[in-house]
A protein has these predicted regions:
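Carboxylate-rich, polar loop motifs that coordinate divalent cations or form catalytic acidic clusters
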Residues: 1-360
Length: 360
């Protein structure tokens, strides 16, 4: 039995490369305004923006600047509860809060009125701000559907057509064909076709509670579910099929890196990485000496323009893992359910005549 255990350890060493150094953690002990981070975003100039439930944070590579409504540098900011971030075609940072839509010009925050069909201003929880290919900003709301902000108009109006019947929006994705995929708060998947019609039935999604959707460079779609793992809709296929290797993680969000690795953020079980080419899944390859990332609630994942991976978390702040890797491999708690040696300190190693490794 011990021999089997040690073989498993050696096998894990051989197939699970790790980053060569611990990353950097930002929290309330290290510059961040709140540990309740809801999204991390990089703008076109390379600045990292971090939305939290107690203020907005901007990182220039050396220092974080905090913006809160009670501070002098935050003129016009009407809420510290920031849900989501994007950037418009003019370079303004667009923010969705728990009650408003804002644009940060670099010197002040400007409220963007959200109007109902009768022209009455709405106060609503903004779930996502998403830049479309035509430069419009699609605004997902909890209760009033999808609103649109045109580039030269300083207000939002409801997206017209059949899509108006969808009121509680969770996630949006515009695909390479110009279709808009919509996940509603009840976990249902819909698609606004280019002719404005809504498709709401997709083979393979029956009974799923859907959390996120992404498309890779090859036209394949990946669908994240709450408790049944990840499904893939391959280019040219007509059905979503489950990826068995990933398992039934409680997934909140997914992200596809530039080299087409699928980063999977879960609710309480950290990050795992799936390689579609090999089918290999790495459980919690990111490492911090300060917190156990394998037990984190992940709210967003991005890759910055230097290849660093950023992860926002509820209760633990934001973590950045540099892209430098080496051939040194790891076994320990951050491998999640592939860890076979526990979380205790290692005090000794011994190799016997049969090339078995004993771990003490």
């Amino acid at each position: 039995m011990k021999s089997i255990l040690l073989i498993l350890i050696l096998s894990a060493f051989s197939i699970l490369p790790s980053w060569g150094q611990s990353g950097k953690l930002f929290n309330t002990d290290n510059q961040l305004s709140s540990n309740l981070a809801t999204q991390v975003f990089q703008d076109r100039s390379g600045f990292i923006w971090i939305a939290t439930r107690n203020g907005l944070n901007a990182y220039d590579g050396y220092h974080i600047s905090i913006m809160k409504k009670e501070l002098a540098n935050s003129q016009g900011l009407n809420s510290n509860y920031i849900n989501c971030i994007t950037q418009d075609d003019k370079g303004h940072i667009i923010l969705g809060t728990n009650n408003s839509l804002l644009a940060f010009t670099g010197s002040e925050f400007r409220k963007i009125p959200m109007l109902d069909p009768k022209g009455k201003e709405l106060t609503t929880y903004v779930t996502q701000v998403y830049r479309l290919r035509n430069k419009d900003i699609a605004v997902g709301t909890s209760g009033y559907g999808i609103l649109l902000k045109k580039p030269d108009i300083q207000e939002c109006h409801a997206m017209k057509g059949d899509v108006e019947k969808l009121k509680h929006i969770h996630k949006l994705l515009e695909d390479k064909q110009g279709r808009l995929w919509i996940i509603t708060e009840d976990g249902r998947l819909h698609r606004k076709e280019t002719n404005g019609k809504i498709t709401s039935r997709f083979h393979g999604t029956e009974g799923l509670t859907i959390q996120d959707i992404q498309q890779d460079d090859f036209g394949n779609f990946y669908l994240a579910t709450k408790d049944k793992g990840v499904y893939v809709f391959k280019n040219g296929s007509n059905v979503f099929t489950r990826i068995p290797n990933i398992g039934n993680l409680p997934i909140d969000n997914i992200y596809i890196s530039r080299n087409n690795l699928l980063y999977i953020g879960s609710d309480g079980m950290g990050v795992c990485v799936y390689d579609p080419k090999t089918g290999i899944v790495q459980d919690n390859p990111l490492f911090s000496r300060l917190v156990n990332l394998a037990k984190s609630k992940i709210t967003s994942i991005i890759e910055d323009n230097r290849g660093n991976i950023w992860v926002s978390m509820l209760q633990k702040g934001v973590f950045m893992q540099g892209n430098a890797q080496n051939d040194f491999n790891y076994m320990g708690f951050r491998l999640g359910n592939r860890n076979v040696i526990g979380e205790n300190s290692i005090t000794s190693l011994c190799v016997n005549q049969g090339d078995q490794v004993w771990v003490g």
